[in-house]
């Protein structure tokens, strides 16, 4: 079974995170940051990954450390759960509309970390949440998974809708990439390793 559990404790945060790539059981997410909880719930639903997160962070300062550390821990768990990546599709991409907004995600579980984030988030805050942290979250996930991740908002007006379309697109593209394909023998690379 493709699962991973990680506890990550720093002077700024304490994160407990577990994933099961092959279970769509209901997720439990409690980061102390309402907007992040909402986005992670959407991600879990659309990726069909069971995701459980408990985070305590120095949110009295701001949400930055918690958002980034949840992303780091999610990336570490994804990398561990994927193991040698035998027989996975490796690539995934999708467009997701959210009302007037259209988000796009393409990713490659190549073992090479890179993030392209092209999203104009015109509203700097949604409630208490700094929208610039969305890019920080995806950077942390991509670099700790070893994932080449491209995210783009093609158009839209509402910042919440733009971000939501990206999290849903990320989930759906990741589901495509991690799906085991019986036609792929070994890893999906001419190098023989990912």
Swiss-Prot record:
The reaction(s) this protein catalyses: D-erythro-1-(imidazol-4-yl)glycerol 3-phosphate = 3-(imidazol-4-yl)-2-oxopropyl phosphate + H2O
Keyword hit for Lipid biosynthesis: no
GO biological process: L-histidine biosynthetic process
InterPro entries named among the record's database cross-references: IGPD_sf (IPR038494), ImidazoleglycerolP_deHydtase (IPR000807), ImidazoleglycerP_deHydtase_CS (IPR020565), Ribosomal_Su5_D2-typ_SF (IPR020568)
Entry's EC annotation: 4.2.1.19
EC main group: lyase
The protein's annotated pathway: Amino-acid biosynthesis; L-histidine biosynthesis; L-histidine from 5-phospho-alpha-D-ribose 1-diphosphate: step 6/9
UniProt entry tagged with the keyword Ribonucleoprotein: no
Compartments, as annotated in UniProt: Cytoplasm
Family from the record: Belongs to the imidazoleglycerol-phosphate dehydratase family.
NCBIfam families from the UniProt entry: PRK00951.1-2, PRK00951.2-1, PRK00951.2-4
Protein name according to UniProt: Imidazoleglycerol-phosphate dehydratase
Gene transcribed to yield this protein: hisB
